[in-house]
Amino acid sequence: MLSSTYGLQHGHAVAITLGKFFEYNMPNSNKLINGKKDKKYIKRTMKNLYKLMGYNNSKKCESYWYKTMQKVGLRFKHLGINKKSNINNLIKGVDANRLKNNPIKLDSDDLRMILDNL
């Protein structure tokens, strides 16, 4: 949706939202898994990702990610998109097939939470 409606390259749109997934993709008992990997595998993978980034938890990785995005000028607020008036369209416009490669399933409520917190 960010790509097609607002003319962003796919990678730009992903970069703007990616920081929120450091926390979201840490499995807990309430989250459903996409694919055949189990929660233990995903948790271990996320912790390894945190270590590769030089941190030990999702919050520090998210903070680092968005500081980096700010330095290079990739911020959601710079897009001129009014989240309050466009959030439903943003959520409806997400390609569900692209979400299948995320290890944790996402629904419209999850997307709303992520977009609200950008």
Q: Which residues does each predicted region cover?
A:
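Short, amphipathic C-terminal "tail helix"
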Residues: 83-118
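Gly/Pro-rich interdomain helix-loop hinge
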Residues: 4-86
